[in-house]
Amino acid sequence: MKMSVVIATKDRQHALERTLASLEAQVGAPPFEIVVVDNASVDATRRVVDDYARGALALRYVAEPEPNRGKARNRGVEQARGDFVLFCDDDVRCPPGWIAAHAAAHRGSTDCVVNGPILNVASYESRPKPRLVNYSQAFLCTCNASLSKRAFIAVGGFDERFDLYGWEDTELGVRLRQSSISWKFAWDAYIWHVKPPEENTLAVESRKAIEKARMARRFLAVHPSARARLATGAYGVNLLRARYLLPDSLLALYAGAASSNRAPAWIRALARAQFLDGIYARELVRALDVADAG
């Protein structure tokens, strides 16, 4: 058994360097390689990869000039030499037994998708253990998932029409589920997803919410089911709420509370969640209206 860790990255040289350091410290793993797909970076990503490639890691650099997460990961799998591919993001810290845990979950099984807990942390030094709240029924999450290269290719890989943030891994998960492949959640295959507050600003998350809403429309076009409408929020009551109960004044109130240093932390968190949900819902209505008009 050989594993290929596929990492798509764009302009995250410092985060990528820490991710590679954690992969260099893996123990008990079967033979593995790392394929870093540079998705049109303008920073020193290539230098970081070259530096680590001179060390103990079996590491290869692949360039994908078109900014597109799905396309970058497809390119990485094309270049992968392992029997199994593991996906992780460029801003994670992998515990020393991460690859070994994924490999163990695949041994003795027919083709399956393996997901592990994703623990969002504010700093690279934070290393909590997984709890029940970290369980996820998502069929595939590219921050921490593995499957055979054969199964990935059999369903066609990522749909490269998902060219903005959101839904590309969910869409691939739908096709994998439809292929009748089995699914496992491996508690010991956990990973820390580093999200520093200074990078996780309201402006950044707002942009992601807008992009995710636009990709939700594409997801619904590919999978026009009741389950998909529920998952994306494109159902009657929620769409009515977005049209008539989310005025600019209310979103401005949420944004102000989310940014207030005088408000308690729980108020800021609640206001932030409400603001981002409102941004997503209103953009989803716009995206669906454009699709209907077309």
Question: Could you describe each region identified by the protein language model?
Answer:
Residues 145, 151, 155-156, 162-190:
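A short, conserved alpha-helix in the catalytic core of glycosyltransferases
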Residues 22, 38-47, 66, 89-95:
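A conserved acidic beta->alpha catalytic loop
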Residues 64-80, 139, 143:
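Glycine-rich, basic loop-to-helix element that forms the pyrophosphate-binding segment
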Residues 14-17, 43-51, 97:
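Acidic helix N-cap motif at the loop->helix transition within catalytic regions
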Residues 96-128:
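Conserved donor NDP-sugar-binding/catalytic core segment of glycosyltransferases
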Residues 22-31:
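Short, acidic, metal-binding catalytic loop of nucleotide-sugar glycosyltransferases
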Residues 210-211, 228-294:
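Non-catalytic, C-terminal membrane-associated alpha-helical segments of glycosyltransferases
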Residues 85:
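Short aromatic/hydrophobic "clamp" motif used to bind/position activated sugar donors
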